[in-house]
Amino acid sequence: MKKEKAVVVFSGGQDSTTCLLWALQNFEEVETVTFHYNQRHQEEIDVAKSIAEKLGVKNHLLDMSLLNQLAPNALTRDDIEIEAKDGELPTTFVPGRNLVFLSFASILAYQIGARHIITGVCETDFSGYPDCRDEFVKSCNVTVNLAMEKPFVIHTPLMWLNKAETWKLADELGALDFVKNNTLTCYNGIIADGCGECPACLLRNKGYDEYMKMKGERN
């Protein structure tokens, strides 16, 4: 464990919760930052606060409602259907979201004396989001370091993992059931197993089933 401080970009979903648990095993001090951008469901904010409290971690909640004004999308507007047309980005894409989140997480890290920033973005289960790519995160890391003259390190523990491998990591961290039962991934705001029908639930549940099958074959 590094005797250093880290900030986790935290939504209360499967990926960011797994990253938080990873951070707690790798850094002496860990805090989380959650962004309120008028998400479709208030439950996301409530779940993030609840998980942080259960794990004994300080949670910073930042108002980013400007994103909703600049980039109307299916994550913030009930009247926009969740869909992904061929050759187009999904309607759940929020332009610049991770750019903004990592920038503000870096500002927070600067203020609280943290060097490490952890985000759960992943390129393997790539949904067409350009700001989930490894090259984007590395570029952003260089930019925030230059902007603040600090040697920040942005970590992406899930970057090359598919959903089954992300469940495997949660299991290796001793928190498979915790992640399964306490996180919110569902676009319809249903905790744990979710609605089972939206794209996020389908991806999450497919990964869980694949991992449990692999785990059963090994045992």
UniProtKB/Swiss-Prot annotation:
InterPro entries: QueC, Rossmann-like_a/b/a_fold. Its EC number is 6.3.4.20. Pathway: Purine metabolism; 7-cyano-7-deazaguanine biosynthesis. Keywords: ATP-binding, Ligase, Metal-binding, Nucleotide-binding, Queuosine biosynthesis, Zinc. SUPFAM superfamilies: Adenine nucleotide alpha hydrolases-like (SSF52402). Zn(2+) binds at C186, C195, C198, C201. GO terms for biological process: queuosine biosynthetic process. Its cofactor is Zn(2+). It is an enzyme of class 6 (ligase). Binds 1 zinc ion per subunit. One of its GO terms (molecular function) is ATP binding. The keyword Lyase does not apply. Belongs to the QueC family. Homodimer. HAMAP family: QueC (MF_01633). This is 7-cyano-7-deazaguanine synthase. It comes from Bacillus velezensis (strain DSM 23117 / BGSC 10A6 / LMG 26770 / FZB42) (Bacillus amyloliquefaciens subsp. plantarum).
